[in-house]
């Protein structure tokens, strides 16, 4: 009887440990659904604290043109951009010209002006998404593609913890979706990888990005609604493309040229540079000696 009591006691202890462990695991799973932990909350507070600290704004921010009239030496180019973008049917554009003549600034300001028009398709919150064709990188297997978008599989690419545990792939929309309803500005578009450019052309035609994954099972009841929608319908990507380049038009992919209106920005002449220098000095409250603007322009 004593041996039996010992066995009963031992079995009860084992069952208790199993029960405690089961409760512990359940609590851990519940906590995982709350993505915020004391550590992540602390890091968020640190970031928000950093955001409250500002040094003086850069000189470039101060002197950058804020209106179309402030853009020097590019009257014809700016007028052409207005006619192409500030319309009921805005067109994709290719901007040619040397660096530093105001291509990006003009595009941003024209969008802001176009949003004020009653007939424009651009909404008040239409985004201006800017990237550089020389730095765009992607994986030929589409495991990583910040421009078009990609799918993070649950095994190799570190999907969200709750998705990785259930084996659910997660689509990651790219810059083309971020620019939906607005403008995607690609500086040095002539330097883009040709295959990536072809993918971009496909998006321009479809106005949508499709996602595929061997790990996606549409019958899985655990798939979140947003992931199911992305795999079923794709991500919207209806935007106006503006590509800027310092290359000669003959060096640009004919397929992209055929879809875009072309605008040429002129090199700045000494008189333009002198006007820019004087405007900058006025904006900064600086006093220049005679001949300084002329010296800079030579």
Which residues are covered by each model-predicted region?
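Conserved AAA+/SF3 P-loop NTPase catalytic/coupling segment centered on the Walker-B
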Residues: 139-148, 171-205, 249-258
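Pre-Walker A (pre-P-loop) alpha-helix and adjacent loop at the N terminus of AAA/AAA+ ATPase modules
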Residues: 55-98
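Conserved C-terminal "switch" segment of AAA+ ATPases
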Residues: 117-123, 154-158, 249-255, 265-297
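Conserved catalytic/switch belt of AAA+ P-loop NTPases
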Residues: 152-157, 195-234, 254
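Conserved alpha-helical scaffold flanking the Walker A/P-loop in AAA+ ATPase domains
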Residues: 82-84, 144-183, 224-232
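AAA+/P-loop NTPase substrate/partner-engagement loops
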Residues: 116-150, 155, 218-220
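Walker A/P-loop
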Residues: 85-136
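Interdomain "pre-motor" coupling segment immediately N-terminal to P-loop NTPase/helicase cores
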Residues: 2-55
């Amino acid at each position: 009887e004593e041996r039996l009591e010992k066995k009963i006691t031992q079995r009860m202890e084992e069952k208790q440990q199993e029960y405690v462990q089961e409760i512990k695991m359940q609590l851990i799973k519940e906590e995982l659904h709350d993505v915020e932990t004391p550590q992540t909350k602390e890091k968020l507070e640190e970031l928000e604290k950093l955001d409250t600290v500002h040094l003086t704004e850069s000189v470039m921010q101060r002197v950058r043109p804020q209106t179309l009239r402030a853009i020097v030496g590019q009257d014809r180019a700016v007028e052409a951009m207005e006619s192409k973008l500030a319309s009921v049917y805005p067109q994709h554009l290719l901007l040619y010209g040397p660096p530093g003549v105001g291509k990006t600034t003009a595009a941003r300001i024209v969008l802001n002006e176009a949003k004020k028009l009653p007939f424009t398709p651009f909404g008040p919150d239409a985004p201006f998404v800017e990237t550089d064709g020389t730095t765009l990188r992607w994986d030929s297997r589409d495991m990583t593609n910040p421009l078009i978008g990609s799918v993070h599989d649950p095994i190799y690419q570190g999907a969200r913890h709750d998705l990785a545990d259930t084996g659910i792939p997660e689509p990651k929309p790219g810059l083309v979706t971020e620019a939906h309803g607005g403008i995607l500005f690609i500086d040095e578009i002539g330097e883009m990888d040709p295959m990536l450019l072809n993918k971009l052309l496909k998006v321009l035609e479809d106005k949508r990005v499709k996602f595929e994954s061997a790990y996606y099972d549409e019958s899985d009841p655990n798939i979140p609604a947003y992931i199911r929608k992305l795999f079923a319908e794709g991500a919207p990507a209806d935007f106006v493309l503006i590509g800027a380049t310092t290359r000669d038009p003959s060096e640009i992919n004919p397929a992209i040229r055929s879809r875009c209106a072309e605008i040429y920005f002129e090199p700045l002449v000494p008189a333009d540079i002198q006007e820019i220098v004087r405007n900058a000095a006025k904006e900064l409250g600086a006093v220049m000696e005679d001949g300084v603007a002329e010296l800079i322009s030579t």
